Amino acid sequence: MAGLQLMTPASSPMGPFFGLPWQQEAIHDNIYTPRKYQVELLEAALDHNTIVCLNSGSGKTFIAVLLSKELSYQIRGDFSKNTKRTVFLVNSEKQVSQQVSAVRTHTDLKVGEYSDQEKTQCWAKERWYLEFETHQVLVMTCHIFLNVLKSGNVSLSNINLLVFDECHLAIQDHPYREIMKICESCQPCPRILGLTASILNGKCDPRDLEEKIQKLEEILRSNAETATDLVVLDRYASQPCEIVLDCGPYIDKSGLYQRLLNELDEALNFLIDCNISTHSKERDSTLISKQILSDCQTVLLVLGPWCADKVAGMMVRELQKYIKHEQEELHRKFLLFTDTILRKIHALCEEHFSPASLDMKFVTPKVIKLLEILRKYKPYERQQFESVEWYNNRNQDNYVSWSDSEDDDDEDEEIEEKEKTETSFPSPFTNILCGIIFVERRYTAVVLNRLIKEAGKQDPELAYISSNFITGHGIGKNQPRNKQMEVEFRKQEEVLRKFRAHETNLLIATSIVEEGVDIPKCNLVVRFDLPSEYRSYVQSKGRARAPISNYIMLADSDKIKAFEEDLKTYKAIEKILRNKCSKSIDCGNTESEPIVDDDEIFPPYVLRQDDGSPRVTINTAIGHINRYCARLPSDPFTHLAPKCKTREFPDGLYRSTLYLPINSPLRAPIVGPPMNCGRLADRAVALICCKKLHEIGELDDHLMPVGKETVKYEEELDLHDEEETSVPGRPGSTKRRQCYPKAIPECLRNSYPKPGQPCYLYVIGMVLTTPLPDELNFRRRKLYPPEDTTRCFGILTAKPIPQIPHFPVYTRSGEVTISIELKKSGFTLNLEQLELITRLHQYIFSHILRLEKPALEFKPTVADCAYCVLPLNVVNDSGTLDIDFKFVEDIEKSEARTGIPNTQYSAESPFIFKLEDYQDAVIIPRQVIYRNFDQPHRFYVADVYTDLTPLSKFPSPEYETFAEYYKTKYNLDLTNLNQPLLDVDHTSSRLNLLTPRHLNQKGKALPLSSAEKRKAKWESLQNKQILVPELCAIHPVPASLWRKAVCLPSILYRLHCLLTAEELRAQTAIDAGVGVKSLPDDFRYPNLDFGWKRSIDSKTFISNQSSSSVESESDCRLNKTTAPDSAASSAANSVIYMQINDQMSVNCTPPCQKSLSHLQTVCFSDDYKAINGISCNGLTNGDWEAESAACFQKDERITCKQEIPEKSTSFHVQNLPKENQPILKECTLSNSDGNVSKPTSDECPSTCTSDMHYDSGLSNRHSSKTLGPNPGLILQALTLSNASDGFNLERLEMLGDSFLKHAITTYLFCTYPDAHEGRLSYMRSKKVSNCNLYRLGKKKGSPSRMVVSIFDPPVNWLPPGYIVNQDKNSDKWESNETSGEDVMVNGKIDEDFDDEEDEDLMWRNPKEETDFDDDFLEYDQEHIKFIDSMLMGSGAFVKKIPLSSFAPPDQNYEWRAPKKPPLESSQFPCDFDDFDYSSWDAMCYLDPSKAVEEDDFVVGFWNPSEENCGADAGKQSISYDLHTEQCIADKSIADCVEALLGCYLTSCGERAAQLFLCSLGLKVLPEVRKLVTNTNVISASSSYQNSTRDNCTLTARTNTDLSSCKGIDYGYLKIPPRCMFEHPDAEKTLDHLISGFENFEKKINYPFKNKAYLLQAFTHASYHYNTITDCYQRLEFLGDAILDYLITKHLYEDPRQHSPGVLTDLRSALVNNTIFASLAVKYDYHKYFKAISPELFHVIDDFVQFQLEKNEMQGMDSELRRSEEDEEKEEDIEVPKAMGDIFESLAGAIYMDSGMSLETVWHVYYPMMQPLIEKFSANVPRSPVRELLEMEPETAKFSPAERTYDGKVRVTVEVVGKGKFKGVGRSYRIAKSAAARRALRSLKANQSQVPNS
């Protein structure tokens, strides 16, 4: 037998490349890709009466249901008007309901079910008529139908389709037969479909079979069609070469074989003879023993003694377990007996051979033959095949797409990552063989594998084999599995995975692998035991599917004769079935023809006339077409293939027509030329088709299918010039950060007044609009409304300042509204006056505010941003404000101006107290008390205690009186012992007054309980700070003005930002034509506010609404009297004021606690739950419960460890040098949102801040709609959450994001009517990518205008007139010493007192003092460690700062990374997302809205040493100046662009937003060349037309406009003209195809004008009967974006004002495939769905059943699983993506049909979605993955994907210390979420058991 000739890949004439196993789904080159057999069967059944012979029941349902659906247009309508009906016949009653539910699930037809023969027998004709009238499909048993026919109740001519289930019964005497007899007499006869799965049972004679089939065909008057699963699987696939090998008998030379056999026989006989009486209940004691011994015997017979020895050894081990666990004596004895026998066998073998090495004498001839075959497959030495190509071929069936969304550009990286792990390449030796050996018994497989491995060690020829075995143990889908089987199961899947990945090249398997297991196409299949029946033969043969393969059957000599007979039978059966195979072409002959040079017959299609030019010949054309179809977009269930029909004409010529899948742009059938034979006709038509595809650009110039990156749409992808690459990180990502200068508004640039030049004087109006409510005024301080005193500040500049909205600052007295009003202009000042003013300006910033520091220099003439701040007062009785020169001069003269007057009092000239001097005073204690000579403390006098004197009792027991305290402690004698004492307050060191102190981030008030405690504290004397007037000097600046001065940094900063925003608004008006360039003089935007009022809980601070409004009105009047000229100058404005007061008086008043901006509170708002392990101790101290508890709402879990001992004093973070202060990223108000709920659609009522109801006083001509957005709203869009302001861009960004997607989608859809979804998707993802948006934003100059870090005047604010002095900067700071108690940092002494707590009471009660100096606070140990590590661990300050660390206050220091993390905490991984550096160096933050992939977010303490951005980024450092520059991540810029879009959308409507996008360079509207250049060309939509009365309107574009100069205008998108293809009888086809859809239109309450849209929305790519419209993919692409936008917009406008985090969660909960699919099923979309895809059919079937059982909607694919028990292999029920798709495509269809009306779509969809929106808004669902990662941020780790045996994906998540959890699903995402869900369930179960300690 040495001459065995096998066709091995290596020897094949086509060269070795062909048989590569990884040519898995080889694209056929000479025949069209075969379609699924069910599809072919359906086609046949539609064409003629058919008997379908199938293997499985499920396939039958598919064909029957789809056939009735296809023919349903014949049965819709009135029975009385001769409409027909469909009848399903079944054999028995119980099958009725199965059929009924199948038809009901997949169609909207009315189904009647009749199973009770008795009952129906007595029905009269009328009753039956009624049944036929009311139902369209009737399912009944055959007996009932026979009766109906016999009694003449209905005639067969009324029936269009008759389905016979189990039609093989018709051969016998059966009602089926009689029914068919009646049929014969009837004309026209209904269409007949017979279904049978049992035409082949066991062995049968081919002749009988043929007869049976013929007879059946006659009876049912049909053609039998067999499914290809009964013949070899692809009827086109090349058949394997079948070989039967006679192996000859085993010659037992040594006699060992016989001895072993005898031993086993005897033992078995003994066991059989043991006649132990077993009761039926008891188990048979000998059972296990018999089983083991007979298995051993089989191995001996089949494989020989060597293997018998091996198996005996294995069995002995297995027996030990049984013996150990066996309780019963008798059983045990039998087991021991068996054990002995096995040991004996082993001993016998050992005498003959050494078990270690394989001796060929002791194996059977079969094994030797097998090894011989395997040797033939030995590969040539190290052939390196280029198999990479295959792995990356995305349209292969087994290509796993990891990405579920096309739009995310971060996805690409991920895909690469994941693919790397998947494709472990085969070693060079596994690259040829891919084989399976089928054996019958499990043990045979195990031992044969062992033998092959052993042989490989000994025989170098076999060394290439890497084998494994798999037995059917536990692979069955539905058996219950125990733990041990589970382990088995896992192992087997691993085996299959390796075989699939070609890590092993030989699989030894039991017959289980014949069916249903997904394995690659093999090129060798060996039947070690002969197949015993046809089914087994076909199934194992069907595994040999590689293009060149061998199917070898090994036969023992004695069996070979009998088997040859069997084989003949099998062949004959196969032949009969093949003939019955639908449209079978006997392809044997075509393949065997020699390949002639057909070019002669039909010339090839050549691109260029040169030799190497790409060409398609008649022989390669079919391959090109197949490849093209495989690249069209489709889902995992559908493999698109061309359809070719060949007809023979009478003249003997053949002609083929080729139909491409319906989502190819080439829609018309292609008719080929007439040819001599069918094969050539097929090829010729393919060649013509290639030519056409190339002409329309579907094949590229290499004649390969173009990818989505197609050249054709190049213009859409004008990707900008490549980014500068010096910056590490991927453009557009969060990891890439760059520096930008901070913008300076044009009107403030170089605007320092010059002598003799005209100036503008603006007054800074300040009015207390919401006084601090009593509950918050803990110290019972008097409130000081700024309008009570006339002296105030003004701004002197050389340029006019545009009007900006009034805005609030929050002082100790409450909310103060700031206005900037022009006082006078055009006047001039002389040099002397200007110098005086300039000196005072510097004095304010350097002395009062102490903002001067070595790094800053005052050079008003050089500074970029320079204007003067100066005091104004009512001068010379005129009652108008003007510059207060007298006051300025007084200050210059005063000796207390800078230092402290050295007045000495003595007994002779004692101190004299004058009350009026102290009424409005700031006092400075004399040096003796405080050590700071250079920077003494300043105090406001809060109260004069006339009843106390220095002799009054001192509050703490150490000293008798105040006088004694000063004497003892400071050796001071007082000269006046009758003077009253002063109660003082610190002047404020908190300079960031942008947001109130007592509100948490959301504008929610802090709870009052803690307030009560504090009030008590402030009422006791002990906690007041008391000074003696004699020991203090009075400062020349009065307290009232000082209080106003403290507001200056916040006012000027806010002014600056608003002017920047206003400038952006004006710029956009020019570029985009949205809004006007300069605002009308009489117009002012409504005030800036934080939008909290509308989202406030009912629990506000003000108990009585009415009283507050009264109060505010009086404020307003007062303001009129005191400053008639300023804030309330016009009636219109006063109206605004009152309204604002009404609103503002609710609860936006600041308290008097410590500043939020310096983080005394650790706030986690609802959506940022605290995470275990952030230790808060570094952040707050004794005061912790008061403030931070206040920040947690009732329902929040606080999991911070509170290790902060209560102390009487409190350590303030303030006392750290500024840049060392820790801060919580989300600490202040970042979570709220300025623009609250302005609906974006035009007609909704406006409730938005930016358009508060101010029309009453303003003329209606102006609104943000016409003028452009409120600068306040623009500012919100420019503010990142890191800026910790009262608003940020997050909500607007989400709205902008979804509108952007919608605008671009609509544009692409309308502009490229021929592009299929894959291409549209690709173009969209490029346009909306962060990278693209970042580039556009950068081009527009957004980065400079953005507000990225917290406003901290001492650190990062440059006062007007100052410049940053670089040289001084570095010299000064490097030489500065960092030791000594009063370390100066930023020119601030570290004892910078907080305005609130009086740390330094000179006589404070010293509880267990760790006596630091008097005025240093006590720290607990934790704090000290914290501060030490902050100050010392950080090393010295140097000049550069590392990239991605936070900027220092000036650019000259850097943190050298601490050696260990500053807080004793584990090193958290740090996610640097959106972190803009500000001056905070110890950082702990969490911000889920900036989540990493899959919503994981990380909480971490920042540690610069760990930061790595790319390989070498760590080394590179960005050095920048905090005052004038800011460092921003690319992604933040992209976010800002989206937020600006959201801002234009909410203010000016959708058209304006589209124009804004166009002006950015994102084309979303078609360009129109302008012809007219006359003045006002209104380019706005009609809704603005009414505003044309007045020429300051909207987009009146004159020819001075930039855009007009370019001559470009933007038109409107046009709906693509055709949605139906030209087709001879299109209308008729359309009516057929959408028959029944009117019910659906009623259900959704929208009648389509153009029904073709409706059809298109429901047509799946696999549905080739629709020849008149496209499939739904394009509409789905459109609908997806529309629904996303509509839902996001709805959520954004929700009056509940969801925070950004909640908004994100809600959006992802509502806009996802699961929800859409569930809704689609709920509203019956699936019943109208048109698809021909068996797998999809079953998935939908399962899903619908599941939904019915569940009967309620699920969020976040939440509990989508069948049962709790199926824990181990929890597989989420699969959500058919197609269902979600048609939900979206219908939205797209309505949008197009209604003339692009979003309102119409929402009108249809809102009622469907409302219940869910309500349900989720009330209780926001989160994705399981995110929830798990929030619960276990440190310990949950997801594994990469593994493939399971049936081709699904498994993901394991390990929660360290709590277990591993697995999830399975069709994609990585589904599996991941299933795993997370199981982990959560387990963790939650454990939590509930362990009550929280």
Swiss-Prot record:
The organism's taxonomy opens as: Eukaryota, Metazoa, Chordata, Craniata, Vertebrata
**Region Disordered, residue ranges:** 400-424, 718-737
Q: Where is the composition biased (Acidic residues)?
A: 404-416
- Tell me where in or outside the cell this protein is found: Cytoplasm
Q: Which Pfam families match?
A: DEAD, Dicer_dimer, Dicer_dsRBD, Dicer_PBD, Dicer_platform, Helicase_C, PAZ, Ribonuclease_3
Q: Name one GO biological process term.
A: pre-miRNA processing
Entry-linked CDD domains: DEXHc_dicer (cd18034), Dicer_PBD (cd15903), DSRM_DICER (cd10843), PAZ_dicer_like (cd02843), RIBOc (cd00593), SF2_C_dicer (cd18802)
Catalysed reaction(s) here are:
Endonucleolytic cleavage to 5'-phosphomonoester
What is the species listed in this Swiss-Prot or TrEMBL entry? Answer: Xenopus tropicalis
Q: Which residues form the PAZ domain?
A: 886-1036
User: What EC number(s) is this enzyme filed under?
Assistant: 3.1.26.3
Could you say which residues are annotated as the site Important for activity?
K1777
Supply the alphabetized keyword list.
Answer: ATP-binding, Cytoplasm, Endonuclease, Helicase, Hydrolase, Magnesium, Manganese, Metal-binding, Nuclease, Nucleotide-binding, Phosphoprotein, Repeat, RNA-binding, RNA-mediated gene silencing
Q: What range(s) does the Helicase C-terminal domain occupy?
A: 424-593
Q: What is its main location?
A: cytoplasm
Residue positions annotated to bind Mg(2+) 2 are: E1676, D1781, E1784
Q: Which residues form the DRBM domain?
A: 1820-1885
Record GO terms (molecular function): ATP binding; helicase activity; metal ion binding; ribonuclease III activity; RNA binding
Identify the residues that the record assigns to the Dicer dsRNA-binding fold domain, covering every copy.
621-713
Function, as annotated, reads: Double-stranded RNA (dsRNA) endoribonuclease playing a central role in short dsRNA-mediated post-transcriptional gene silencing. Cleaves naturally occurring long dsRNAs and short hairpin pre-microRNAs (miRNA) into fragments of twenty-one to twenty-three nucleotides with 3' overhang of two nucleotides, producing respectively short interfering RNAs (siRNA) and mature microRNAs. SiRNAs and miRNAs serve as guide to direct the RNA-induced silencing complex (RISC) to complementary RNAs to degrade them or prevent their translation.
Write down what this protein is called: Endoribonuclease Dicer
Binding note for cofactor: Binds 2 magnesium or manganese ions per subunit.
According to the lineage, what is the superkingdom?
Eukaryota
